[in-house]
Amino acid sequence: MKIKSLFVCVFLLCFNHVFSQIKEHLVHEDYERLWLTYLPKHYSENKSYPLVIALHGGGGTAKQLMNNTRKRFNKLADKEGFIVVYPQGIKKSWNDNNTRDTNGFARKENIDDVGFIKKMINQLTSKYAINTDAIFACGVSNGGLMSQTLAMELPNKIKVIGMVASNFGLDEINKIKEVSPFSILFIHGDADPIFPYNKGEIRVFKKTRGPVLGIEKSIAYMCRLNGNSGEPTINAIKNSSIKDNCTSEHLVYPNLKNPSLKVELIKVKNGGHTWPGAKEQRLIKKLVGKTTQDFSACDKLWAFFKSTMN
């Protein structure tokens, strides 16, 4: 009898684990669009949950982002009580509506990724108990640019984003009159060999992928948009991992008129084109640079998102 009870318990634990991570899909413009949904432990229809949309980089997948970040968002979802989804780009790319180049399949074919994400959000909010005032987007590289595009083109749905190893394309300079304010956290390594920290060209395998503003001008754009002014407060992040040869600091740009509109930067000194706290990809380290282990970008992103809910 004890063995039978133990079997039932193990089965239920496995079932709950499978249920918490769900493969979902919809059809948009004749493409089947896919994503992974992770529901927190003890999910209840009687509660209301924030939604975090996590977007992989160019050449990546939804599953890779989840696994390479050590499933940290999932663990935070269990602890903090939010839903996280990992959408999949067509042929591993996102159409971030930036004219810098047409090398990515999604940009080349003008895939309607904004329409897909909008439809995905609508499907999720009709299916799960989601707080529609707390929908956040974040991503790395091409996924970071896609997050920016979502904030600019879906202002009624997404008002807070995070960009990892990415900053604004040169096009954005001319968009400021068309864009509604939104809060943003940049996380960027100043030794990123692919997506330049300073103004320059994105380069992949020595081929240019178009110009970007760089962090300084991207922040200036956001401060102008949101009304942030003055010198930032700067706090060092504990250097808990000496071996990574990186240090980091957190810059917060003040907004006295509207503190709810936030502009922040975590600068990773000597950091590369990587997601802080992620598994280090040794085979491509020379291509992407160093990965700091002093903190998890997932933790910092969620803390930032959560701060905008207060």
Name each region found by the language model.
Residues 4-14:
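Sec-dependent N-terminal signal peptides
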Residues 18-51, 64, 69, 76-80, ...:
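A domain-start/cap signature at the N-terminus of enzymes
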Residues 49, 57-61, 271-272:
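Active-site glycine-rich loops that stabilize anionic/oxyanionic intermediates
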Residues 54-57, 86, 267:
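Structural cue for short, hydrophobic secondary-structure segments
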Residues 80-92:
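Conserved alpha/beta-hydrolase
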Residues 106-128, 149:
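Alpha/beta-hydrolase active-site loop
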Residues 186-188:
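Short beta-strand/loop motif that positions the catalytic acidic residue
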Residues 208-249:
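Acidic, glycine-rich loop-and-strand cores that form catalytic or ligand-binding grooves
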